[in-house]
Amino acid sequence: MKKHILICGEKGVGKSTLIRRLVEEARLTVGGFCTKMDENAEGAMRPIYIYPASLPTDQRKRGMENLVGRCGNFGRQKEIFPEAFNALGTAYLQGTSSCQVIVMDELGFMESDAQAFRRAVLQTLDGETPVLAAVKNRMDVGFLRQGGGNP
């Protein structure tokens, strides 16, 4: 019986921190993805990058190839690159066959036009490997409800 944990909440409440600590404490083999906004970037639009969940923070590189979007003005302004989710996000989810837990940090509104990635998320949730996911607490993250039997 699969057991997934989806942690929902507003920005800054500690969803990602909780996931990181749970994985570290349990010493699990991890697959999946993490997205992270570059808070130190200059300009009004902050870049957001996607990384393999297994990659240590100090080894994460930022470049156009893993740029999934830019946000500004508390999410009211956004520029999203669904092709990065479709290519990298999907690959990170499909490469999880030997993992003990799949991390999805985080799921939100930015994936709305990334159809291949959304399908990969739903397929992962239909799988047997436990998922630990951070989910933005927003009305426009409805694609997770499409999965029928998914949590």
In which residue ranges do the predicted regions lie?
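Conserved lysine of the Walker
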Residues: 15
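Hydrophobic anchor at the beta1->P-loop junction of P-loop NTPases
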Residues: 7
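Phosphate-binding/switch loop-helix module in NTP-utilizing enzymes
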Residues: 70-122
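Alpha-helix C-cap/termination motif
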Residues: 25-26, 95-96, 127
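N-terminal phosphate/diphosphate-binding loop that engages ATP/GTP or pyrophosphate donors
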Residues: 20-74
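Extreme N-terminal starter segment of soluble prokaryotic enzymes
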Residues: 1-4
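The conserved Walker
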Residues: 11
